[in-house]
């Protein structure tokens, strides 16, 4: 996609949405729930509506200096905000608005790509795609600016794929009356490769996972197949139900028909809620999976503790409401409903072990994924292991956890 085409696409997509409703104002709450949200906001004292994933975004490929420049422009904006306490709630698509500033950074990378060739152009386009994806974060279904940003992210990703030295194929896997869109990443097509199915959480896209392949899996000649969770990204048309691993299960069962992968050597990686789905799949399809790794996954504790869910920041509650298709939210009812998402309540972590060795990791003090959840997963997995990552060395912690993850998969897939 040339710079001119990209600029035109951006203008076409966003022109109708100059006065689009700001993200934090999209989800409606019952009066009693609104009072609770006000209480939580006052207690937490956060300056941002969004949970800023600075280190995760840097690991995924955002330049840390550029990231801070974008956040500084948002924070210093003089434009009106939906909520003056939250810096990232600038209304209208212009300077200071979250989607605008991240899209602008994406455009800069896209422009740079136009001045480069081959691998350098490809990397600049992958960076552009990631910036567009962050522009849409946390990807609420009713957020028009986020939907347009996602179009740009997907377009830049496919353009980057064409210029890359690696082989990236967009697959359409039949499911129910539609198709699941997945991306297969390969070092070559000379022979079938071991493959890892990767899923992110409920507030990120499959196109965010490029660096996991380039910096980790490709070095070991392991293919990566990315799939969005139901209700997100390419899978947004599929509702999020208690059977939330069904898309990944359909993809797993279709692997035998893909000539580039060895369907006898399959691993799983799940981040955040994607980790919950991967553990679930490790019980449902244990004969087809060699190993599984989860990072920061909510498994039981948060779902079984309505009080904890009720105290979550608004962005997380907005995401849950959006994924479940709720137009008006009752937090008390929502927190009770979430118990059904616990893998213990569903009966998976209660009696028999899965044959799949699962490595369950999370950051020390993570409120969504406590160590007790990981211990439970490890206990119900043959040769399973729970690992706590020290938050004192969070930057190193990210790298350490990924190195551990790759080693875990390598031991099972490459022997």
UniProtKB/Swiss-Prot annotation:
Domain of life (superkingdom): Bacteria
One Pfam family per UniProt: FrsA-like
Gene Ontology molecular function: carboxylesterase activity
EC number per UniProt: 3.1.1.1
SUPFAM superfamilies: alpha/beta-Hydrolases (SSF53474)
Entries under InterPro entries matching the protein: AB_hydrolase_fold, FrsA, FrsA-like, FrsA_esterase
Alphabetized UniProt keyword annotations: Hydrolase, Serine esterase
Hydrolase keyword on record: yes
Activity response to pH changes: Optimum pH is 9.0-9.5.
Principal EC category: hydrolase
Reactions catalysed according to its record: a carboxylic ester + H2O = an alcohol + a carboxylate + H(+)
Annotated thermal dependence: Optimum temperature is 50 degrees Celsius.
Stated role: Catalyzes the hydrolysis of esters. In vitro, prefers short chain alkanoate ester as substrate. Displays highest activity towards p-nitrophenyl acetate (pNPA). Has weaker activity towards p-nitrophenyl butyrate (pNPB).
Record NCBIfam families: PRK05077.1
HAMAP family assigned to the protein according to its UniProt record, in alphabetical order: FrsA
Protein family according to the UniProt entry: Belongs to the FrsA family.
Name used for this protein in its record: Esterase FrsA
Source organism per UniProt: Vibrio vulnificus (strain CMCP6)
Taxonomic lineage of the native organism: Bacteria, Pseudomonadati, Pseudomonadota, Gammaproteobacteria, Vibrionales
């Amino acid at each position: 996609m040339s710079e001119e085409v990209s600029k035109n696409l951006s203008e076409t997509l966003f022109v109708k949405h100059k006065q689009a409703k700001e993200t934090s104002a999209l989800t409606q709450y019952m009066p009693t729930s609104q009072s609770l949200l006000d209480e939580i906001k006052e207690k937490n004292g956060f300056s941002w509506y969004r949970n800023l994933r600075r280190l995760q975004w840097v690991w995924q490929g955002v330049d840390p200096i550029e990231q801070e420049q974008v956040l500084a422009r948002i924070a210093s904006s003089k434009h009106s905000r939906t909520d003056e306490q939250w810096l990232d709630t600038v209304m209208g698509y212009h300077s200071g608005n979250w989607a605008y500033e991240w899209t602008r950074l994406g455009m800069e990378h896209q422009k740079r790509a136009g001045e480069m060739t081959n691998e350098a152009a490809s990397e600049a386009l992958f960076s552009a795609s990631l910036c567009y994806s962050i522009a849409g974060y946390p990807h609420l279904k009713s957020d028009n600016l986020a939907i347009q940003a996602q179009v740009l992210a997907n377009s830049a990703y496919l353009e980057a794929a064409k210029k890359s030295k690696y082989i990236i194929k967009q697959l359409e896997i039949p499911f129910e009356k539609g198709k699941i869109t997945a991306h297969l990443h390969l070092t070559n097509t000379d022979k079938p490769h071991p493959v890892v199915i990767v899923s992110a959480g409920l507030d990120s896209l499959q196109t965010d996972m490029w660096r996991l392949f380039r910096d980790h899996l490709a070095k070991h000649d392991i293919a990566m197949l990315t799939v969005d969770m139901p209700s997100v990204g390419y899978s947004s048309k599929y509702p999020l139900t208690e059977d939330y691993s069904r898309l990944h299960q359909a993809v797993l069962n279709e692997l035998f028909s893909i000539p580039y992968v060895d369907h006898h050597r399959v691993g799983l990686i799940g981040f955040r809620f994607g980790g919950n789905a991967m553990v679930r799949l490790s019980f449902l399809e244990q004969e087809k999976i060699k190993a599984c790794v989860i990072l920061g996954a909510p498994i039981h504790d948060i779902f079984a503790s309505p009080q904890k869910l009720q105290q979550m920041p608004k962005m997380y509650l907005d995401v849950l409401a959006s994924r479940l298709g709720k137009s008006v939210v009752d937090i008390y009812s929502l927190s009770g409903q979430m118990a059904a998402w616990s893998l213990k309540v569903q009966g998976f972590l209660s009696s028999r072990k899965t044959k799949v060795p699962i490595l369950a990791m999370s950051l020390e003090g993570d409120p969504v994924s406590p160590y007790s959840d990981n211990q439970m997963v490890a206990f119900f997995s043959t040769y399973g292991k729970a690992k706590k990552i020290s938050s004192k060395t969070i930057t190193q912690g990210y790298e350490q956890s990924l190195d551990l993850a790759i080693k875990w998969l390598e031991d099972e897939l490459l022997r």
